[in-house]
Regions:
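A short, Lys/Arg-rich alpha-helix, primarily the initiator
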Residues: 2-28
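Short alpha-helical elements of helix-turn-helix
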Residues: 16-19, 44, 58-63
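Short basic helix-loop element that most often maps to the first helix and adjoining turn
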Residues: 20-39, 64
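Conserved hydrophobic/aromatic packing and binding residues within compact polymer-binding modules
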Residues: 22, 36-37, 47-50, 76
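Recognition helix of helix-turn-helix/homeodomain-like DNA-binding domains
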Residues: 41-55
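DNA major-groove recognition helix of helix-turn-helix/homeodomain DNA-binding modules
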Residues: 60-75
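Short amphipathic recognition helices of helix-turn-helix/homeodomain-type DNA-binding modules
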Residues: 75-82
């Protein structure tokens, strides 16, 4: 198994493995990070980390956020085209 230096991997809106539109959808819904975090039952720090590409959400969290923002998970998070 090959070792990867995780400090050099940037996840999130411009990560090569996941494109992230959360901040745009949150702002369109006129929600602060705090308001979204309360509605999605997650910490504000988690929302911030997702938006800033530090954290890729679990399937359950992605579903909670998309339900809160009344959109599909695929609207928020997409795989980049090859």
């Amino acid at each position: 198994m090959r070792s990867t230096n995780l400090k050099n991997i940037r996840m999130g809106r411009d990560h090569q493995k996941l494109l992230n539109n959360l901040e745009e959808f949150r702002k369109t819904a006129k929600l602060t990070q705090e308001e979204l975090s309360v509605k999605a039952e997650v910490s504000r720090k988690s929302i911030n980390a997702i938006e800033n590409g530090v954290y890729i959400p679990s399937t359950v969290l992605a579903l909670k956020i998309s339900k809160t923002l009344n959109c599909n998970v695929e609207d928020l998070f997409q795989l980049p085209e090859d």
